Every structure is written in structure tokens, then in C-alpha cells.
Amino acid sequence: MSTTPMDLVFYGCANMPTTDGVVAGGAVTFSTLVTFADMATAGTVDYVSSSASDTAATLTVTGLDSTGTSQVETKTLTGTTIVAGAQSFARLMSVVAGGTTAVGDIAAISATAVVSGTAQTGSANSTGTTPALFHLASGQGASVTEGQVIHTTGGTGPNQLARIIAITGYGTDIVAVDQNWTTVPDATTTYTVNGGALLRKLPNQITTVRRPFYDISADVPGGSARTYYEKVFAVNNNTATALTSASIIKQVDPAGGGTLEFALTTALDDTGTVANRQTAPASGITAFSTGAAPQTIAVPSPGNLPNGTAPNAAGAQGIWFSFVLPAGTAPDATSFTMRVSGQTV
């Protein structure tokens, strides 16, 4: 059974503060993901579950409106029926589950879909060598991005949620998704693709999806540059096959005035912390990358992301990000892309 993109997950860590002056870093936290797709345009958020039983679970969205002001909205789910939000968001910062523990997958998704339509024949569950797939309507593959959420709305297999993890490599208008389908979609399945965040039930309950470098800010013009640090983990959740000769790659730099670099912890399952998010890790890491993307750092010896029971506590590779904000840098709706590469059978 090969390691596929479905198996490779970026998790958060124990201490991911949103203010300065408190400890940052620590051990991997499997209930936190750092992967989502931002709003394509400012707008409201819809809240939904894949299970009709989710009538007491809540989702809290924190984000910025079009003026850059922080806003928070909490909604109680009504099962598979969409709950429409009222607050407009331009950028999402975090989505946090609360209330009764969710029975199904739950999501906060943009009310305005990126695309919608009827699927083509060709969706599939993982074969062990390829990930689960979804076949979009003709021509839509060029309009979607990794991280966006597919919500099936009718036809075969309605009320399913999955996150896009790859948009190339599997055929025209075919995207890879992060989990198997309960019912594989077919040519009758209707759907939307949306920005937002998916909090999966399996292989473990995700309760938080958040943006790295949440709520950082530059010094005033004429002041000093500020450097912030954030820790995440790359994990291989394949239960049978290690990812060998593994590397972590900064694939796409953030736009705007900031500069992102990264370093790897020299041991798996690292628990190191820093005094606050403006303090650099002093030991137990490789050198930080330098320069524009793409930048690659090989996983330190033995060089593998091991297999193990998902979520895989046997081999989480720590990643420290550094983000330099020059004084006077204006707020910017931007993102960056990290990837994991390696060899598999």
C-alpha cells in the first residue's frame, strides 16, 4: 500500500498563541489542522454537517472583515441542513468546534461557491496506490484550488464533505480528496466547491482549523522589523508504508511584504518550545531556509516519515516557520504552500 497525498497531513502544536508574550511550540496536537482555503471574495459563511445527528455541535469562526476588523461568529449546526451565517468575512483565521462532539464531518464554508455542478463518472475511493478522487464537471478543474471543500448536495451520495488535496496528476477535471467517500459519487451527484474549513471525524476528531501566524502585525512605519515563529508538524498517516527519503518543501511564498523561511526539528516528535512567538528556537533544529520558493530541506536522519496507526504519533516531523514583517507592512490577504515529498512503494 503506497503512501498517497491522503496520508500526509499538517497538524498544529500544543501552543499556537494569538498574542505575544506567551509560550509557543511544543508537541504535536492531532486535533488541530493548519490547512484550509480562504474566502475567494468577502462574504458570509455557511455551517453544515455530513450527519443529520449533529444538532448540538457548534462552529465558531474568527476572521477579519473587509475593513480588517476582527469578527467572531458562532452557529449551532442543524445536521445536514445548511445554517446561514450573517457576518461577512474577508479572511478566515480559525474555525473551532464546540458544543456536543460532532457525529459527522463538519464544515464552515463560503456561502458563495467557487463552482457548482453535477459530477462526471470517475470518482473513486483510494486504491492503496492512488488517493480518493472526485470528477468535477467539465472545465471546472482549472477553477479550484487545494484546500477547498467539496460538499455533495444531491443525487448519489449527498451530504458528504471532503477537502481537495491535489488538483493535478489524476486526469482532466479530477481532483484528489482527503478521505474516502461513504458513497462514491457518480454522474448524478450534485455538489458545490467552497472556500472554508473542514473538521473531519476520522481518523480522529479535528476540533480546530487555523491559520499560521494568526493575528501578527508589523511595527509602525519607521520602526523595526518583527520576526515571528510558529511550529507545525508533517505526519504520514499511512498505516503500512513509510515515506522514505522524505523532504519538506516551501513550494509557494506568501505575497506581500513579509518573508517566510522554515527549519526542521532534528528529531521526530519534538516537544521544544520558545518563550514567545518572537523568540527563535535556539537548538534542535536545522538551519532555516533562505531565499525564494521553492526551498527544500531533507528530513533529518533517518530521513523517513514512518508509518503508524493514524493519527501517527510514531513520527511527527516538526517544522518551525519564521516570518519577517518589515516595519509599516500593510495587512495582506495572502497564503503560502508547503509540501511533503519522498519515495514510496
Where in this protein do the model-derived segments appear?
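Beta-sheet-dominated interaction scaffolds and their linkers
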Residues: T18-T32, N204-N237, I248-I249
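Short, solvent-exposed loop/turn segments enriched in Ser/Thr/Gly
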Residues: G26-A27, S224-K231, G315-I319, A330-T337
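C-terminal interaction-tip segments
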Residues: G63, S110-S116, T329-V345
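Short, acidic/polar linear motifs in exposed loop/turn regions
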Residues: W181, N236-A240, A327-T329, T344
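Intrinsically disordered, low-complexity Pro/Gly/Ser/Thr-rich segments with frequent PxxP/GP/PP motifs
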Residues: A267-A275, A292-T329
